[in-house]
Design a protein with these regions (language model features):
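Cleavable N-terminal signal peptides of Sec/SRP-targeted secreted and luminal proteins
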Residues: 4-22
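N-terminal hydrophobic or amphipathic helices/low-complexity stretches enriched
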Residues: 18-70, 111, 354-358
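Second-shell loop/turn segments in exported
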Residues: 38-45, 59-69, 93-97, 133-145, ...
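A non-catalytic alpha/beta surface segment that caps or lines the substrate-entry region
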Residues: 47-114
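Active-site-adjacent substrate-binding region
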Residues: 65, 224, 230-358
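Solvent-exposed loop/turn segments at secondary-structure junctions
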Residues: 94-97, 113-115, 125-129, 182-186, ...
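Structural recognition of the beta-strand scaffold that forms the well-ordered cores
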Residues: 108-109, 118-122, 176-179, 223-229, ...
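Acidic/histidine-rich catalytic neighborhood of metal-dependent amide-processing enzymes
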Residues: 136-255
Length: 358
C-alpha cells in the first residue's frame, strides 16, 4: 500500500458514493447494539487463542504470487471455508509484471450466495517480493497474514450464530470474505505494478450479474467493503477515512468502549497499549487515504471502511515484519471488536446460549 496525500479526494469520493448508493438501492443501515450478555458471548465466551494460532501459523511463510508458498496458503484458506460449508470461488488470472507473466488467484468465500446483499471483509494474502542480504524472504506478518487469520477466525467463531440466522432487520444480508492476491508491487508502486488481484476482481464484477440480486452486478451487491491491513503489532491504531462510512467507524469505537467497560477485552492487550484506544474517534484522515485493495472498488462507488493501521506500524516493509514482532494479545482485542461488529451488522442472535464455546 502507498500513502496518498490529496486533500479533496475524500469529499469527492463521498459525493460519488452517495450518488451511486442511491442509484443501486443501498441503504444506510441502523446497526444492532448487543446486550451485556451478547457482548460477553461474542467477545469472551467465543474467544479461543489456540484456534486463532492454528489459522495464523500456516500464513507466516513467504507467499509471493505464483510460488509454492502462495499455493500452500491458498489451500489453507480454501480448505478452511470448505470445511465450514461456505461457497468458495477462485478468480484465477495471469498478468504481466516487472518479472514477466505471473499467475494470480483471488479467493471469495460466501456464507450464503443466495442472499442478495453482502457484508464484505477483505484482506490480501500475498507477501511482498523482498529478501534480506542472505536471501531470506520477507514474511509480512502484519502485511497481511494477521488480517487473513482474523477473518478466518471470525468465520469460525460466528459459525453457530450464522446457522441460527439473522433477525428480520438483516435477512437480506450475508457475510462474504475476499482474499486478494498481488496487492504488493514487485518493484515501484505504480498503476500497473500493484493491486493486481483487486483491480482484476473489481473489473470482472462490474459486468458480472449477481443472480441473487435482481439483475444488479456483483459490485452493487456489496453493502459495505471492510478492508483489513497492517494489523498485528502493539502500535496499531485506526482512524476514519471516509465520511460515507464514518457511522460504522463510530460503531467500532463504541464496541471497543463497551467491551472495555464490561472488562471483556484481553487485559494483556490493553496493558500493551498503555490504555490507548485502538479506534480513535477524534482522529479523521485529512488526506486522500492509502492506496490499497479498496481503491478499485472505491472508484466504482462501493462504500469503504478501511481498517489499516495509521501511522503505519514500525515494522512496515521491513524484514522485521515477522512473527517475533507480533503482539497476539492486541490482535485478540481487535478480533473481539471486529467479531462483535460483524455480528451486530448482521443482526445475529448473539444471546443464543447454544452458541457458547463448549
Amino acid at each position: 500500500m502507498k500513502l496518498k496525500r490529496i486533500q479533496c479526494i475524500c469529499f469527492l469520493t463521498a459525493v460519488i458514493i452517495a450518488f451511486t448508493g442511491a442509484a443501486t438501492g443501498r441503504k444506510k443501515r441502523s446497526l444492532k447494539y448487543s446486550s451485556s450478555k451478547g457482548l460477553r458471548i461474542l467477545a469472551s465466551d467465543l474467544a479461543d487463542h489456540n484456534e486463532y494460532m492454528r489459522l495464523l501459523k500456516p500464513m507466516l511463510i513467504a507467499r509471493q504470487p505464483d510460488t509454492d508458498g502462495s499455493r500452500q496458503v491458498i489451500l489453507h484458506i480454501t480448505d478452511h471455508y470448505n470445511k465450514l460449508g461456505w461457497t468458495v470461488e477462485t478468480d484465477n488470472f495471469a498478468n504481466q509484471t516487472p518479472y514477466g507473466m505471473k499467475n494470480f488467484t483471488n479467493i471469495i468465500a460466501t456464507y450464503n450466495p443466495a442472499v442478495p446483499n453482502k457484508l464484505v471483509l477483505a484482506c490480501h494474502f500475498d507477501s511482498k517480493y523482498m529478501h534480506d542480504k542472505n536471501g531470506n524472504p520477507f514474511i509480512g506478518a502484519i502485511d497481511s497474514a494477521v488480517p487473513c487469520a482474523i477473518m478466518m477466525d471470525i468465520a469460525s467463531k460466528l459459525d453457530c450464530l450464522l446457522k441460527k440466522g439473522s433477525a428480520e432487520e438483516a435477512r437480506d444480508l450475508t457475510l462474504q470474505m475476499i482474499f486478494f492476491d498481488g496487492e504488493e508491487a514487485y518493484k515501484d508502486w505504480t498503476q500497473t505494478d500493484s493491486l493486481y488481484g483487486s483491480r482484476h476482481l473489481a473489473k470482472a464484477w462490474k459486468t458480472q450479474l449477481d443472480p441473487s440480486n435482481s439483475g444488479k452486478n456483483r459490485l452493487d451487491s456489496i453493502d459495505v467493503f471492510v478492508l483489513l491491513d497492517l494489523i498485528g503489532t502493539a502500535d496499531v491504531r485506526f482512524m476514519s477515512f471516509f465520511s460515507s462510512t464514518h457511522h460504522l467507524f463510530e460503531k467500532l469505537v463504541r464496541i471497543e468502549s463497551d467491551l472495555t467497560q464490561h472488562d471483556l477485552l484481553n487485559r494483556l492487550g490493553a496493558a500493551a497499549r498503555n490504555g490507548n484506544h485502538l479506534f480513535v474517534s477524534s482522529q479523521r484522515a485529512q488526506y486522500g487515504g492509502v492506496e490499497d485493495d479498496h481503491k478499485p472498488f472505491l472508484s466504482e462507488g462501493v462504500p469503504i471502511l478501511h481498517l489499516i493501521s495509521y501511522p503505519f506500524p514500525s515494522v512496515w516493509h521491513k524484514m522485521s515484519d515477522d512473527e517475533s514482532h507480533l503482539n497476539h494479545d492486541v490482535s485478540d482485542n481487535i478480533n473481539r471488536i471486529l467479531r462483535t461488529f460483524v455480528s451486530n451488522y448482521l443482526y445475529l442472535k448473539d444471546t443464543n446460549s447454544a452458541c457458547r464455546k463448549k
